[in-house]
Design a protein with these regions (language model features):
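Conserved GTP-binding G-domain of TRAFAC-class P-loop NTPases and closely related GTPase folds
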Residues: 49-110
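Active-site environment of divalent metal-dependent phosphoester hydrolases
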Residues: 132-135, 175-178, 204-208, 267-268, ...
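Divalent metal-coordination and catalytic microenvironments
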Residues: 129, 172, 187, 201-202, ...
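Short glycine-/polar-rich loops that comprise or flank the Walker A/P-loop
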Residues: 12-14, 38-43, 90-93, 165, ...
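N-terminal active-site segment of His-dependent metallophosphoesterases
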Residues: 104-184
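Active-site neighborhood of divalent metal-dependent phosphoester bond hydrolases
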Residues: 65, 70-73, 162-164, 176-253, ...
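Acidic, His/Gly-rich catalytic cores of divalent-metal-dependent hydrolytic chemistry
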Residues: 279, 283-378
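Conserved nucleotide-sensing/catalytic segment adjacent to the nucleotide-binding pocket
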Residues: 1-43
Length: 378
């Protein structure tokens, strides 16, 4: 019954606290499994109190008065053995309260999940995949009403909107285009000043692994980005690495009415936190097949979407942004000679600027038609 109730609460997205002994690893494993099934992060709060306190409190309970002392002693031993294994078992955070005083004095404060920004209501300007097209990004921000802030060398390092609007980037800032460092400098500055949000794209994820010293294939424009970054100083590259590590998979905004991610996200994953959620948000899903160009066939999740929140994303280039079932893909192939597109929210107005040129030849032509109606609205 316990696990059934826990599963129902987690499925509904409700705070779930399990008050149980759970000193055996197998008992905890069932709860960790439930957390993973529902894409939430389990937290352990360990009450490590002296044996005599446990005995006194058990004696004061009518349903536990006859509990043998040896049972309490066994529980104590099992608890102590468990302290070093909880994180390896899958608990994201472990809090150990030692002694009755700590247990009595502790204050439990709920923290928002790092993707939960429902309290931010905008207005927002959601920007599609930039892919190193710094000049086009500056032009788009200007058209959206932002004033660029330049550093001592004349490089765009921030942007301010007179009406306090917030830019939200769907990821894939880098690769393929002529100035990935310039795009990073501008977006990092906007995020640092609180004037922008940014989620991770698959290209940031790959660049981050490279900067972390891991072996990755320098394909799909990464080689150009690495070459461009080599001309920057070490402090800038270190700042880029830190920035990428801090990017989350998606944001839930405006009271839950807007979800921004890189590759799309079904409703069951909104506000959830797991490797499965992050993978979908960064890469989307595929059918397991490849097309005539050797590229994976994308699973058409948006065709089945019926969620309340509008999902705005990028990742898959299309010649024109169009709404489909309250989802909108903003990747209009700027680096391939298309456009750089933004969505004004809550106005649901599309704003775009043309690419200055074809910066990178696509593996296959952009799709002939974008999702949604001709007016770009649902």
């Amino acid at each position: 019954v316990l696990h059934f109730i826990v599963g129902k609460r987690l499925a509904a997205g409700r705070l779930t606290v399990v008050d149980a002994t759970n000193v055996q690893a197998e008992s905890r494993a069932q709860l960790v499994r439930l957390a993973r099934e529902h894409d939430v992060l389990p937290v352990a709060i360990v009450l490590d109190v002296p044996e005599h306190v446990c005995a006194e409190r058990n004696a004061a309970r009518a349903d536990r008065a006859g509990l043998p002392r040896r049972v309490i002693q066994r529980h104590q031993r099992e608890l102590r053995r468990s302290l070093g294994t909880l994180e390896r078992e899958g608990f994201r955070t472990v809090h150990v309260l030692r002694g009755a005083r700590e247990v009595e004095d502790v204050e439990v404060v709920r923290e928002r999940r790092f993707n939960d920004l429902r309290h931010l209501t905008g207005p927002f300007d959601v920007v599609g995949d930039v892919h190193g097209c710094r000049a086009e990004l500056e032009t788009l921000l200007d058209r959206l009403g932002y004033a660029l802030v330049r550093d001592a060398e004349g490089r765009a390092a921030d942007a301010v909107h007179p009406e306090g609007r917030t830019a939200v980037f769907v990821g894939d800032l880098v690769d393929r285009g002529p100035d990935s460092p310039g795009v990073l400098r501008l977006v990092m500055g906007m995020v640092a000043s609180g004037r922008a949000l940014c989620v991770s794209g698959n290209h940031e994820n790959k660049l981050g692994r490279h900067l972390d010293g891991r072996t990755v294939q320098h394909t799909h424009g990464l080689a150009e980005t690495v070459e461009q970054l080599a001309k920057e100083d070490e402090a800038f590259r270190a700042g880029v690495a830190t920035f990428i590590k801090g990017l989350v998979s998606h944001y839930v905004l405006d009271g839950g009415a807007l979800v921004v991610c890189h590759a799309g996200l079904p409703e069951k994953y909104h506000g959830r936190t797991s490797g499965r959620v992050r993978s979908f948000a960064l890469y989307g899903d595929t059918t397991g097949e490849t097309d005539e160009f050797g590229l994976p066939v994308r699973y058409p999740w948006a065709e089945e979407y019926r969620g309340r929140a509008a999902v705005v994303y990028g990742h898959t280039p299309t010649p024109r942004a169009g709404w489909l079932n309250n989802t909108l893909c903003l990747d209009t192939g700027c680096t391939f000679g298309g456009k750089l597109t933004a969505l004004r929210w809550p106005e649901r107005e599309l704003v775009d600027v043309p690419a200055e040129r074809v910066w990178y030849e696509p593996t296959k032509p952009l799709a002939a038609e974008a999702p949604g109606g001709a007016d770009g609205r649902p």
